[in-house]
Each structure stands twice: as C-alpha cells, then as structure tokens.
Amino acid sequence: MAQQGQQGQMASGDSNLNFRMVAEIQNVEGQNLQEQVCPEPIFRFFRENKVEIASAITRPFPFLMGLRDRSFISEQMYEHFQEAFRNLVPVTRVMYCVLSELEKTFGWSHLEALFSRINLMAYPDLNEIYRSFQNVCYEHSPLQMNNVNDLEDRPRLLPYGKQENSNACHEMDDIAVPQEALSSSPRCEPGFSSESCEQLALPKAGGGDAEDAPSLLPGGGVSCKLAIQIDEGESEEMPKLLPYDTEVLESNGMIDAARTYSTAPGEKQGEEEGRNSPRKRNQDKEKYQESPEGRDKETFDLKTPQVTNEGEPEKGLCLLPGEGEEGSDDCSEMCDGEEPQEASSSLARCGSVSCLSAETFDLKTPQVTNEGEPEKELSLLPGEGEEGSDDCSEMCDGEERQEASSSLARRGSVSSELENHPMNEEGESEELASSLLYDNVPGAEQSAYENEKCSCVMCFSEEVPGSPEARTESDQACGTMDTVDIANNSTLGKPKRKRRKKRGHGWSRMRMRRQENSQQNDNSKADGQVVSSEKKANVNLKDLSKIRGRKRGKPGTRFTQSDRAAQKRVRSRASRKHKDETVDFKAPLLPVTCGGVKGILHKKKLQQGILVKCIQTEDGKWFTPTEFEIKGGHARSKNWRLSVRCGGWPLRWLMENGFLPDPPRIRYRKKKRILKSQNNSSVDPCMRNLDECEVCRDGGELFCCDTCSRVFHEDCHIPPVEAERTPWNCIFCRMKESPGSQQCCQESEVLERQMCPEEQLKCEFLLLKVYCCSESSFFAKIPYYYYIREACQGLKEPMWLDKIKKRLNEHGYPQVEGFVQDMRLIFQNHRASYKYKDFGQMGFRLEAEFEKNFKEVFAIQETNGNN
C-alpha cells in the first residue's frame, strides 16, 4: 500500500508538472498571439482605409521592398507585383492588392512596417492616415497601447497630446526599471498632472551598456530615448527617430527621467574626480543665491560637459527642435523638485518667442577633454517654421519664470547676444554664431542655425522630416525669451545642410531693402569676427535677403513718356535718312539696290512672273529678283521684296502703294520649246497667257504645259497636274495627239461603251471644257437651293460638277453612260428648281455647250429624234 501511495503521489506530481508546463506554454502562446494580432477596431479601421492607404503610396519603393525584406510577402508574390508594374498596371491598384494580402495576416508588425520612418518620408500622404490610426488606438485601447512591454516591440500609435491620464502614470511607478535605465527629459502631457510627474523617477545608471529601446512615438518628432551609461568611461547613445516633425521628449515605459541631469555622466565624474572648473562652482553658487528654490536643487551647467574616464568628449544636451518641429507641451516644466527639466524653444510666426526655460542656463564655457578636444555644445536655437506651445511657462513644482532680456520686434531688426569663447588647449579660437529670429516678413532668409543639425545626445544625427502640422500653432505663445547665452555651434564638425528657399520678389521686401540700405554697413559683421557678450548686433532683414539671392540680369532702363516720344521721333527720322525723294516710281525703269549691288528693274518683265529675269546690273547681266537678292548678299533673308530697294524703299512698299505690280508665282518646269508653224513663223509660248489659269482665269502658282502655252493650277486641270512627270502635256495637247478620224455612231452605242483609257480621256476633256465656261462657277459646288424643302421636293439625287470630277478622278464610272447621266442630272435639277429667267438662261447656255462638245468629241451622228 505504501508503495502504491508513493507511486500515486509521483504520478500526481508528474501530472501537476505537466499541467503547469502546458499552462505556461499556452500563456506564452497567448502572449505572442496577443502581441501579433491587433484589436478588432484597429483591424477594421485598416480594412476600411485600404483605398486611402493605397492612394497615398505613389511608387513601389520603399514600401514593397520593405515588405519583402521583412518576409511579409513571399518572393514569388513580390515578383508577381513587379510584373504588374512592368505591365503598366496603376500603382494604386497594385498597392491595394498588396494591402489585401497583408490583411490576411494583419498584426502590429504590419502597422510598424507600414508607418515606418522611411515610408512616411517617401509618401507624405501617409502622415494624415498615420494620425487617424493614432486616434483610433487612443479611443479604443489607450492603456494597452502604452503598456511597458508593448513599447519595445510594437509601434506606439497614440495621438500626439492625447496620452494616458494620471492614473496610468501612478501605475508606472511600481514597475521595475532595469539597471540600464533609458534617460530622457520628461514630458507632462495634457492628461498628466504635475503631481504624477513628480512621482516618476529613474534610478541612477549602473554599470553595463545601455539598452536600445526603439519606439515609434506619435506626434511626430524625435523619440529621445537615451542610453547614457558609464562603462569604463564610455557613454553610449542610442537615439530613435520618429516620422513626424514635433520633438517628443518621452521616457521609456512612462518612467520619468527628470533626475537624468543630476545623474549625468559628467556630474558623476565630477563627484569622483572633483569639479575641475572653478567657474562652474561660482555659477552654481550664484544660482543658489538667485532662486529660493535653488538651494534645494542641484544646478546643472548645460554648457559644461565633463570629461569621462577615457577622456572622450560627451555630447551636450540639445534643446533645439528640428526644422519644422513644434515645441508644444515640451517647454519649461520642472518635476520632482530636484533638477531643472530641459526646455524647448520655439519660434512663433508673428516673430515673438515663447518662454524658453525656467532658469538662466550658462552655456558659454565648453570644457576641454583630457585629449584636448573641445566638447560639443548645446544648441537652444529654434528651427525654421517652429511653433510655440500653450504650456511654455508652466512649472510642475512652482519654479519661477524669469523675464527675457532680449525680445523679438514684430517688424524690424532682431537682436541676438553673442558671447566670447575661451581658447581651447590648442589655442584655437572657436567661432561665434548668433541665432537670428525672424519676423513674419515675406522672403526672410534663414540663419545658419536653421540649417545646422542638432548634435545633442537625444537628437544625435537623425533628421526629422517636415510636416504641415508643424506650422499650425502660432501667436498663442508670443511673449518674451529668457536670457540664454548663445555659444558657438560651428565646432560640431558637421557640414551645414543648405536649404533651398523660394525666391520671393514681394514689393514689401524690395521696399524694405531700399529703406534700410543706409544701415547695411553698420549691421553686417564678417564671418568669424569675435564680438563682446555685452554688445548686441542688430541685423536687418534686408541684409539677410542679400546673403543668398540677388536679382539677376541687367537693371532695366526706365523711360518717361517724353523720353519714349523722343526715341520714336529719333527712330522715325533715322529711318528716313537714306530715302531718296527724287525717284519717279511711275517710270517703267526703276533703279534698285541690294546691299552693294545696283541694277535697273524693268516693270514689264516683272509682270510676267518672278522667274523672269527683269533686273539688269551695271555689267549688263540679267537676274531674277531672287538671284539679284543672292547677288547682293541677302540670300538668308529669302524675301526679295524687302531686300531689294528702290530709292531706299523696299519693293513691297512700292507694290502696296500701286507703283509696282505684284508678279504671279509661276513654276517653270523646264525651258519652253519654240513651236514652228507651217509658215515657219516662230511663236514664243512663254509670252502668252502666263499670268492666268486656262480654267479659272486666275493667277497664283501655275504649271505650264510642255507643248502648248496654256498654264493651269494643279487642281484645276483634269486630271490633276503630275508635277513629277517629264514632259507633261495638258489635256488639250493629248486630245490633239489622239486619232482624228473617227466613225460616226449613234449616241446609244457611245453610252454603252466601257470606260477605257481613251473614253476616260474624252470624258475628262468634256468636263474640263464645262469648267472653262464662266457659268460653271454656279454649278461647281452644291447649290444652296438644295437646302430649301419646297425646292427639293421634285428633285432627284443632288449633283454638282465637283462631285462628278471627284468620281471621274477616282475612275468611278464603269461606262460612259454614268458620266453623261450625272452631267444631264445637274441641268435637269436646275430647270426644276429655278423659275427665274436670269438663272434659267445660265443653265441653258451651259447645257447647250456640253451637248455640243459631247457630240463633237464622240462623233455622234445626229438624228431627227435626238438633240
């Protein structure tokens, strides 16, 4: 029995052990599942906004590549999406498919990848969606989102300025903090009370390296999670940047780091090695004497970083927000009654400066390390476009706010204090830099500090992208600026990042530049010049505008109305200076010049055409107007009407005033042959009818027949002129070359003939003869009476000459009958439509001419029954 009881106890022990192991495994799996799966409201919000997210992602890189690198999508799926891009599928459509794939396994890691810093910089439209996710996270599970365990392994998506209440802060006090504490400046959110802020404290940092605790904090800005640890004299910094503009000073796990300043590595070394700066001890005594509460607090010289065991320089703390950052809720607040909390300064748009700090810090004296290297200094300068905070002047422990010794004028120059720098051990003089605070003037330039990257432990080397929300708050925090001794920021060893700025040309800026021109030499200082700390340099905005941009180009000459009139008079007199008023423009021979060449123009020859040689030079040679222009050296102008002059006047002016005829443009194909008649009398065909078309009797660009003297427009001839054919004969000459002896036949036989080339030529000749008649112009186009309903009731198919010409050129008539029927249809419709005598006679004459030519060309035998 005892043995059986012992075996039963062992079995029960094993079962309990197995049960505990299974419970622990299930607990771990539940925690992992809880960490991976998002709450239902956040998942639903993601699913409802997939279209907006896909629209914000405008290009594949870096979003798609980041998902592939984090194994959220497979390599095969990645190649599938790339193939879609190569097939010109819209990016938004492909991104929607990608988000649909992420929806299947949606979790916190997907949100962290989606709203990463790189993606928010590459796709600015994601910023608004990111803030919407923050609001949803805050509304549904604020405590879960701020859990200490969650801060290190998932992004924090609570909205800026909407943190937990003070109860959540009190719950954080009992949480154990690791020895490698992450120190940062505390931040009293609107939801926090000053009492809760006072209860938060960090233990002093011990040995070991600082932990890296990345966190995606909301509100946009720098997550100042610092790992400042003294391990054999070395300090390690692990900053983490966030994808927004506002600098957020927040501790890990909501643990207050107000005692970071009092327990900074520099002070620890000072306690071990003794304070090596007599000036610092004097400053500490002065601070104790000035402030009643200062007796209970340790003063911390932010400008005097101490030396570590290994002699490596410590980086000074940075209170400078990045460009475009807000200083909201991060101003001069003191917690725990022990050490002053760092203050952030911000520049309001109106030019006023919000309260910077609760106490006056001495930032002037950089210490020298054991190796002689200067310490990196603290920068308290605001970036461009930063906004003020509503809570700038609040104190958590009732600390006094000091009055400002320098203030920013609303419309004028800006005063900034310049402090002397001591020499380092190598005797090198450190450069001075002054912070210039600008008024809200269009086109005001930036100071050198706006382009300088923050070099403190919290901001280190990262940059925060600009955001539109960084410029929302403005004049609420306009006030005075505390007295801060500005130290040199040019010894940080980092290159200045130049920033392109829109070149403004407002009239107010230009006017201010002219008004303050007299003060330029007094206010501008050479770079690197040392100025005493008591002297203030007033720098006008006009000087700043001249630092970068100057108006390019030559200054324009301005003329009054009288000056313009005088110029016009001088110009008109100069144009008549070389005119010859004694020339008789009505004479048949006119003296002409082109450059240095002189000649005589014959009007009668010019009337024949522009290709006729009508200008005879002094040496007896004849030239066409174009050749004479080339002879005079004006070949590039290609306008002889302006290049060739008569008495100082161009030939165009003579043609416009009727002194000279405007010659027609005739294109000569080749040299004309002289035909010999039977009586051996020579006739020059070039001298007959060279200025008008045989069909329309109009000038212009004409083509000459190589056999006869007739000329035609390209489209007037039937068929159209073949310019490339050599020799080219008109249809009149071709009809003469056709066999003259034809047997007479009946009209019915002619109409039944097929449209062979010979019959095609005869039909074209008949139509051209009709066009040569003056009455044809009325029947060439569609008559307007076809649009009258009453007139068109008894008509057949509308027909006109151009329509027949088009069909004939396209060889649209298979027989001669079709051509003759269309011609007679024109006259039939005319007789049925027009009842007036004048118009009817016009149609009768043209019809009679056609019938006459038809019988002659086709040799139709007349009968008594047919006309």
Swiss-Prot record:
PTM field: Phosphorylation at Thr-726 promotes binding of PIN1 and subsequent isomerization of Pro-727.
InterPro entries the record matches: Bromodomain, Bromodomain-like_sf, HSR_dom, SAND-like_dom_sf, SAND_dom, Sp110/Sp140/Sp140L-like, Sp140_Bromo, Zinc_finger_PHD-type_CS
Domain SAND: 580-661
Span of domain HSR: 22-138
Positions of region (Disordered): 260-341, 365-432, 486-580
UniProt biased composition (Basic residues): 494-512, 567-577
UniProt-recorded Gene Ontology molecular function terms: DNA binding; DNA-binding transcription factor activity, RNA polymerase II-specific; zinc ion binding
GO BP: defense response; regulation of transcription by RNA polymerase II
Sites of Phosphothreonine modification: T726
Compositional bias per record (Basic and acidic residues), positions renumbered to this chain: 268-301
Motif (Nuclear localization signal): 495-514
Keywords per UniProt: Bromodomain, Cytoplasm, DNA-binding, Metal-binding, Nucleus, Phosphoprotein, Zinc, Zinc-finger
Record's compositionally biased regions (Acidic residues): 323-341, 384-397
Induction conditions: By gamma-interferon.
Residue ranges with Low complexity bias: 404-416
GO cellular component annotations of the record: fibrillar center; mitochondrion; nucleus; PML body
Tissues and organs where the protein is expressed, per its UniProt entry: High levels in spleen and peripheral blood leukocytes, much lower levels in tonsils, thymus, prostate, ovary, small intestine, and colon. Very low levels in heart, brain, placenta, lung, liver, skeletal muscle, kidney, and pancreas. Not detected in brain, liver and muscle.
Any further remark recorded for this protein: This antigen is recognized by autoantibodies from patients with primary biliary cirrhosis.
PANTHER family recorded: NUCLEAR BODY PROTEIN SP140
Function: Component of the nuclear body, also known as nuclear domain 10, PML oncogenic domain, and KR body. May be involved in the pathogenesis of acute promyelocytic leukemia and viral infection. May play a role in chromatin-mediated regulation of gene expression although it does not bind to histone H3 tails.
Protein name per its UniProtKB record: Nuclear body protein SP140
Organism: Homo sapiens
